UniProtKB/Swiss-Prot annotation:
In the hair cortex, hair keratin intermediate filaments are embedded in an interfilamentous matrix, consisting of hair keratin-associated protein (KRTAP), which are essential for the formation of a rigid and resistant hair shaft through their extensive disulfide bond cross-linking with abundant cysteine residues of hair keratins. The matrix proteins include the high-sulfur and high-glycine-tyrosine keratins. GO terms for cellular component: intermediate filament. This is Keratin-associated protein 5-5. GO terms for biological process: hematopoietic progenitor cell differentiation. Belongs to the KRTAP type 5 family. Interacts with hair keratins. It comes from the Eukaryota. The keyword 4Fe-4S does not apply. Residues 35-234 are annotated as: 15 X 4 AA repeats of C-C-X-P. Keywords: Keratin, Repeat.
Length: 241
C-alpha cells in the first residue's frame, strides 16, 4: 500500500508520509493519520473510507465515489461540512465556547464574566452581565450615568438594570432642572427667565415693573398694569378713573 503522492509504505496508520502534497497536515480534518491507497487519498474536508455515508458529513470535497463514505464518525472529520446538526448536535462540537457562545451548534452557555458588558464586569457575580444568554446585572456605579455617578450610592444610576437615582445638583440642568431622575427644582432667581419667568419648574413670578412690557403689560405672568395714557395705543385708552 502506498501513501498519497508518496513512494514507500505507510503501515496501517498511514502516517508519516513526509512528502510534499502528502497526507500530513495537508489532509485538513483527517487528524494525525492519512488515508492510504487503494482506499482513497485525503481530501481537504474529510477522508473517505467505508465507515459513514457522505450525506452525514455533508459530502466530501471532490465526491466520495468509490471511497464509500467518510472515515469514522463526523467528529473525526474535524467538523463536518453542513453544520453541527448533521454531526449529532452540540455534543459532537465539543460543547460551548468559554464565553457565552451563541453558535449554531451550541446551546446558550451559562453566564461568564468574560461575556458581560463593561458596566457589569465585576461586583455582581455570575448573574451580572446584560447578555442575550445572561440575567440582567445589578446596579453598579460604573454603569451609572455621569450625573448620578456619586452621592446616591448603588440606587443611583438611570440604567435599564438600575433604579432611578435621587436628585443631585450635579445632575440637574442649569437652574430649574427637569431631569428624568430628579424632582423638579424649586424656583431660583438664577434659573428664572429675565423677569416674570414661566418655566415648567418655577412658580409664576409676581409682576415687577422691570419685567413688564413698556406700559400696560398683559403678560401671562404679570398682573395687568394700571392704565396710563402714556402706554395706551392712540385713541384706544380705556382708562378707568
Amino acid at each position: 500500500m502506498t501513501c498519497c503522492g508518496c513512494s514507500g509504505g505507510c503501515g496501517s496508520s498511514c502516517g508519516g508520509c513526509g512528502c510534499s502534497g502528502g497526507c500530513g497536515s495537508s489532509c485538513g480534518g483527517c487528524g494525525s493519520s492519512c488515508c492510504c491507497k487503494p482506499v482513497c487519498c485525503c481530501k481537504p474536508v474529510c477522508c473517505c473510507v467505508p465507515a459513514c455515508s457522505c450525506s452525514s458529513c455533508g459530502g466530501c470535497k471532490g465526491g466520495c465515489g468509490s471511497c464509500g463514505g467518510c472515515k469514522g464518525s463526523c467528529g473525526s472529520c474535524g467538523g463536518c461540512k453542513g453544520g453541527c446538526g448533521s454531526c449529532g448536535g452540540c455534543g459532537s462540537c465539543g460543547g460551548c465556547k468559554p464565553s457565552c457562545c451563541q453558535s449554531s451548534c451550541c446551546k446558550p452557555c451559562c453566564c461568564q464574566s468574560s461575556c458581560c458588558k463593561p458596566c457589569c464586569s465585576s461586583g455582581c457575580g455570575s448573574s451580572c452581565c446584560q447578555s442575550s444568554c445572561c440575567k440582567p446585572c445589578c446596579c453598579q456605579s460604573s454603569c451609572c450615568k455621569p450625573c448620578c455617578s456619586s452621592g446616591c450610592g448603588s440606587s443611583c444610576c438611570q440604567s435599564s438594570c438600575c433604579k432611578p437615582c435621587c436628585c443631585q445638583s450635579s445632575c440637574c440642568k442649569p437652574c430649574c432642572c427637569q431631569s428624568s431622575c430628579c424632582k423638579p427644582c424649586c424656583c431660583q432667581s438664577s434659573c428664572c427667565k429675565p423677569c416674570c419667568c414661566q418655566s415648567s419648574c418655577c412658580k409664576p413670578c409676581c409682576c415687577q415693573s422691570s419685567c413688564c412690557k413698556p406700559c400696560c403689560c398683559q403678560s401671562s405672568c404679570c398682573k395687568p398694569c394700571c392704565c396710563q395714557s402714556s402706554c395706551c395705543a392712540p385713541v384706544c385708552c380705556q382708562c378707568k378713573i
